[in-house]
């Protein structure tokens, strides 16, 4: 699995969302590389890991990333948040958890109302085979919908989608299955390490209410909503997201994390 390492300082693992790759975090790299050693993951089937055969399932991916990185804070965006949360719940070496537009459960249920209907991800899966490019374009449009900087963010995501080669259909389908079926809420009350939940106020995929509910389930969880932000708030509001991550990591004690 390809993991780009850049910067200097405390270690921070960044995991991208569905269909993208680690380069999507460029605005955060520009702002954080002087304070952090950043580990930018390309998930299997995406970017420079396009030919990686690791199954896109939580334990396989998390163990592969953990084997290649030192003790660190893990930060996941959207789908990437499921990997980061699983790591925080299972690995002592994870010092803290930052979730950007990511919750432990992405689909709606009777006891989890602030989420999308399962049919949303099911439809994307059905459409991939018949209209690969169009399906990805529609998903990118959802990523930026509502953001105050939607046009610029969509242009950036389109560039990031193809600059390292398109993701594989297999990886996209595996990612959709994770989004449809994963429920990690049970891990939150016993998480045992600090967590930060960063939402975009105008996010159409993951509502701020869901982020706040997740933070409330995690002991000591902190919730932050980026005003006018969409599903990728680190693009149009990179200064605010970077500052939040800096403040969060600075507040961690040396006891947070292990070997």
From Swiss-Prot:
<comment type="function">
    <text>The physiological role of BioH is to remove the methyl group introduced by BioC when the pimeloyl moiety is complete. It allows to synthesize pimeloyl-ACP via the fatty acid synthetic pathway through the hydrolysis of the ester bonds of pimeloyl-ACP esters.</text>
</comment>
<feature type="active site">
    <location>
        <position position="203"/>
    </location>
</feature>
<comment type="similarity">
    <text>Belongs to the AB hydrolase superfamily. Carboxylesterase BioH family.</text>
</comment>
<feature type="binding site">
    <location>
        <position position="231"/>
    </location>
    <ligand>
        <name>substrate</name>
    </ligand>
</feature>
<comment type="subunit">
    <text>Monomer.</text>
</comment>
<feature type="active site">
    <location>
        <position position="231"/>
    </location>
</feature>
<dbReference type="GO" id="GO:0090499">
    <property type="term" value="F:pimelyl-[acyl-carrier protein] methyl ester esterase activity"/>
</dbReference>
<dbReference type="InterPro" id="IPR000073">
    <property type="entry name" value="AB_hydrolase_1"/>
</dbReference>
<dbReference type="InterPro" id="IPR029058">
    <property type="entry name" value="AB_hydrolase_fold"/>
</dbReference>
<feature type="binding site">
    <location>
        <begin position="139"/>
        <end position="143"/>
    </location>
    <ligand>
        <name>substrate</name>
    </ligand>
</feature>
<dbReference type="InterPro" id="IPR010076">
    <property type="entry name" value="BioH"/>
</dbReference>
<feature type="active site" description="Nucleophile">
    <location>
        <position position="78"/>
    </location>
</feature>
<comment type="pathway">
    <text>Cofactor biosynthesis; biotin biosynthesis.</text>
</comment>
<dbReference type="GO" id="GO:0009102">
    <property type="term" value="P:biotin biosynthetic process"/>
</dbReference>
<keyword id="KW-0093">Biotin biosynthesis</keyword>
<keyword id="KW-0963">Cytoplasm</keyword>
<dbReference type="GO" id="GO:0005737">
    <property type="term" value="C:cytoplasm"/>
</dbReference>
<keyword id="KW-0378">Hydrolase</keyword>
<keyword id="KW-0719">Serine esterase</keyword>
<dbReference type="InterPro" id="IPR050228">
    <property type="entry name" value="Carboxylesterase_BioH"/>
</dbReference>
<feature type="binding site">
    <location>
        <position position="18"/>
    </location>
    <ligand>
        <name>substrate</name>
    </ligand>
</feature>
<protein>
    <recommendedName>
        <fullName>Pimeloyl-[acyl-carrier protein] methyl ester esterase</fullName>
        <ecNumber>3.1.1.85</ecNumber>
    </recommendedName>
</protein>
<dbReference type="Pfam" id="PF12697">
    <property type="entry name" value="Abhydrolase_6"/>
</dbReference>
<feature type="binding site">
    <location>
        <begin position="78"/>
        <end position="79"/>
    </location>
    <ligand>
        <name>substrate</name>
    </ligand>
</feature>
